[in-house]
Amino acid sequence: MYEIEKTERVKELIAVTKSDSGISGPELCAAHMELGRILADGLRELDPDDTTVVAMLRGGIFFAEGIYFALRCRFETFDPKRQEFVRPGTKNVIIVDSVINTGKTIEDILDLDMYVACCVINENAVAKCKDRLYTVRVSKNSFVGAGVKKQAAGRGPDTTMRLFNQI
């Protein structure tokens, strides 16, 4: 597992992305994009001509764009609710999502030679990705994303809804 170094700037960005930050919309998207660019430093050894970033829709789009801009590779999107996953033809494939709670969606499409990148992953899902995981941080917290503004009773603000300014 690769976890980015927590510089002061990274800590500021993490504070913006946390569910209890109260921040939504473009400011949150910009934080995801910048964190994606920073995380991409750990993936620099990959040949951009033979690498595809696959953004999990909708929540992974901005984090994936940051990685894409930094690596200058290929880019695709995947909607697990509406599509069957088709592995891109490049040697290197990076599946990108903003939040991984259980890891089930990723586990269903992950091959042994693919990478996973995320802003945050629940500690219980880390083992599903093993040494293929690139993350900003690992969290002990896990809750169901919902259209609420505050965390309570196992539910919290849905990251995708926050990214698109819908709560």
Functional labels for PLM-detected ranges:
Residues 1-167:
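PRPP-associated nucleotide enzymes
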